[in-house]
Amino acid sequence: VNHYTVAKKRRHDDAYAPGGKGFMRPDRATIVYCNRIRQAYRDVPILIGGVEASLRRFSHYDYWDDKVRHSILVDSGATLLMYGMGETSIIECANWVADGMNPAELPKMRGICYMSKTPDPTCVQLPSHQEVSTDKRKYAEAFVIQYDEQDPIRGKRMCQQQDTDRYLSLIHISE
């Protein structure tokens, strides 16, 4: 987004880079930065959030690659994704980490996504990544479920199988 226009033309400036210079940040910055953190600090929990992470929390269509990509949690290798505005999630997470909580306990927070080896039985199951990446109707079905479950009053947890043994689970903000 920060490097190209919708017409895939290169932007010459970047309002969020030092001096407004373009191309100071990598494409898919969240994925690149998480991979660099993993190289330097193998076992450190990585928490991601913001617009890029929020919009790519489930399997999603990537305009630049013209294909459906996995959740950004899979691609980045991050431990936890905080979506939406994240004001309460980041404070709660910081308090948990400061208190020495195990990162495995963090998935109990609201407004987050995490990976697990088994699907949460209370989740609304979305079509799997394999299904949405090969079938347009399944992609549309997954989108409708995601849209419907974003309701702040009646929204439920959602799960989506990403690989044969990994499931993305989303804990709704209103829980």
Residue spans for each PLM region:
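Glycine-rich beta-alpha loop elements in corrinoid/cobalamin-binding modules
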Residues: 1-167
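Conserved small/polar residues in nucleotide/adenosyl-binding loops
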Residues: 171-175
